[in-house]
Amino acid sequence: DDAASDNHFIVESQEKIIYLTLQVRSSSLPTTICCTEALLRNNPKAPFSMLRLLLLSAICTAIPVNAAIRRTSLSGVSRSTTPHRSTKEFGRKKRMLRLSKFTTTATAGFTESSYDDDNGYKKASERRFGDSDWPQYGTKYLPKQTIERAERGNKIEKLKLEKCGSAAFEEVHEFAAAIREGTTTWEDLDIDDADVRLKWAGLFHRRKRTPGRFMMRLKVPNGLLTSDHMRFFADTVGIYPADVGVIDITTRQNIQLRGIELQDMTELIDGLQMRGLSNVQSGMDNVRNLVGSPIAGIDPEELVDTRDIAKDIDAMITNDGKGNPKLANLPRKFNIAVSGSRDDFAHTSINDIGLRPCPNKESGEMGFNVIVGGYFSIKRVMESIPMDIWIKAEDAARFCEAVLLYFRDNGSRGDRQKARLIWLIEDMGMEGFRQAISDKYDEMFPKKKGGAAIPAQPEPWAVAAGTNTPTQPHKKRDILGVHSQKQEGLSWVGINVPAGRILPDEAMALADIADKYSQGEIRLTVEQNVIFPNVNNTKVSELLQEPLFNIGHYFIPKTDKDFPLSRGLVSCTGSQFCGVALIETKNRAIELSKRLEEELKVDMPVRIHWTGCPNSCGQAQVADIGLMGGPARVEKEIDGKVKKVAVEGVNIFLGGKVGEDPFLGEVYKKGVPADYKYLIPIMKDILKEKFGAMEK
């Protein structure tokens, strides 16, 4: 174990900080040589760092290191992370050399943070308002008439006027330092700072469920990760109690880290930046994670590779992950998705802006037809509607910026239930909105004039060639399991992650598997699952035998009939951590699907989504069967009398569909008690009647 353990060193020079991970093995000289070569390539001005690296490598070759990694927080409290289960149970594999700050992972379409030779490297925690990255707070960018409407607006608008949420970009580090120094506690923070404004820094205080602990929501454009990211996530949450320190994959191809304490945020945020990830503008009135195709660049049926497009849009929104005050004071949250194929793996139909690939009928150039206005809320759910605009792929970020700035300045600052983009569109009418966006685009990008005025293009696959006959509907593909890529000799392997919940030891095991089979690349899906791309076909059978996928939790379906209910399972956080949720979801969802699979024979995949409340973070309306937390009552004998008492319950939705011809499901039954003795019989009846299930 000692020989296989990792050692983490910080090699400092006058200009750079390079995070290195070296394998401690008796044959570490080749590793040292490779490390030195990489260091010189990326840092030719730092020979002293090279010499220190050689010295450190020589030392670690001679001296075994304990398998437990000692991690010291910035508060000076030494915390020990014991070996994760993956070290012994899953078998720790040899890790790739990681130059976390400088490595470019080309296969992932991911470039980690680069060093600016002119200006020097600046940590996230070193940025200040008034600098070039943040010239002024977000409120300062609002036009006078927008501020006047905000002054008459809802309580959140007044809170933002009192102090802009973008202030949290900087203040999160001030709060963390004060807590580390013992000059304050989280309880002493202004409640609006702790529970609202810190969301601009991606921090969600779970006051109701886990007081003093935060969830951090990241920005992971297109769901692209590396093994180094996954290990960093595991190390981050692994120091906290097992019941709170977990990793969740979200329905936006994103990551949420749970159980984090505020004093540790600076270390975490700087570590994210060093790895090319960001936490800024992931909550409240900001644009959420950019969603794209999880099989971009490897899909045989791909129309557009969404990776660079999603990253470009995200870079525009977040100022390359540093934080962008200019777009940090929207009237409400905003979602953008970019589809790469007819399957629409990004679910564009439920986003404020959806980009759906389509060639220009005259030039043949591939671009996007734009749909707008999709969203879920307590009071209303809405599918996106056509905007009748086609844009070039190269103009996607520009178009999104024009829409966002127009929405920022003109969207409602009153009733927050009527502040999403669709309400502005309906107030203006689609023709008026379309013209306003075209004018805004031309004003912002005069050299691209007319780029947002091209009418939507006909989809060539909508009718059979040379006829007016509609083609057969395109069935959305299931990307779990093993699938051939467009690159000869390679496959992607889709892994089911039950309800999207990952424990630290599991994250370590996933990272090791990625290093062994997919060049360290990991991708996330909106169904809360994981994709390993670029797996050599000669290695697929070996991957399928990995212990992680054969212990009854994670699984890789081998046929369309394997795990018919578990494979499509999606769940929000539920009441375990979310104070808004009415019911517990994740554990209940996993258990119910397993019980139903044990008792029923189901010959087709059935997508089941759980969401804890009407906000529908679990997207119950797009599922074959959706279960939404709600009130229910059961009869119970109390003091000799039968009375109806309130219990956790669900409203059941049926008929949702995603893909080329999406449809939102409708309520089938309300007020069903969530207890299995009530829920299982009803679910069985639905599966038998609607999906042909039979008792085993």
For the regions a language model picked out, list residue spans one by one.
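Cleavable N-terminal signal peptides
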Residues: 65, 104-106
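Secretory pathway export signals and precursors
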Residues: 1, 30-31, 56, 457, ...
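N-terminal chloroplast transit peptides
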Residues: 21-22, 26-40, 44-89
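Peripheral terminal and linker regions in Fe-S/redox and tRNA-modifying enzymes
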Residues: 109-696
